[in-house]
Regions:
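Chalcogenol-based redox active-site neighborhoods
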Residues: 1-161
Length: 161
């Protein structure tokens, strides 16, 4: 079942890189008691994700936070080491938390898995943006095609705040 507006996010675990190495963070750690702008991408460093989606998030990050959003998170079905390298390479280290969903646990639990095996990428996440308030989905923008950023970018979510 695909998650929809009004649904509570299911319990899942992410990995986030810290100075001590990868640390487990739960859905509650990330979303409980907070308003979070969540952006999902099919893969770190992939063309559309790196050249289009990520810039749309960072160009709008301050404005999104100015509208009362506590934090911005970016999730991908990648490991914590790849997500940390991607975060470091963006030079936007403090604007967003990069969440590794390495086994697609969260992605599958919300029904957003994408089979990209035909491109040698295995199971990935659909591209979407989501506004989550205290663990409840308030806005959801699912991209109709993985190679485009038409409704899932930072500008769209900003316009909905």
């Amino acid at each position: 079942m695909t998650i929809k507006v009004g649904d509570k996010l299911p319990e899942a675990k992410f990995r986030v890189m810290t100075a001590e190495g990868p640390q487990v963070k739960t859905t509650d750690d990330i979303f409980k008691g907070k308003k979070v702008a969540l952006f999902a991408v099919p893969g770190a460093y992939t063309g559309t994700c790196h050249k289009m989606h990520l810039p749309s998030i960072f160009l709008n990050a301050y404005a999104i936070k100015d509208k009362g959003v506590n934090s911005i998170a970016i999730v991908s079905v990648n490991d914590a080491f790849v997500m940390n390298a991607w975060k470091r390479d963006t030079d936007q280290r403090d604007e967003a938390t990069f969440l590794a969903d390495g086994n697609a646990e969260f992605t599958k639990a919300i029904g957003m898995e994408l089979d990209a095996s035909g491109n040698g990428l295995g199971i990935r996440s659909h591209r979407y943006s989501m506004l989550v308030d205290d663990g409840v989905v308030k806005k959801l923008n699912l991209e109709p095609a993985p190679g485009k950023v038409e409704v899932s970018g930072g500008d769209t979510l900003l316009g909905q705040l």
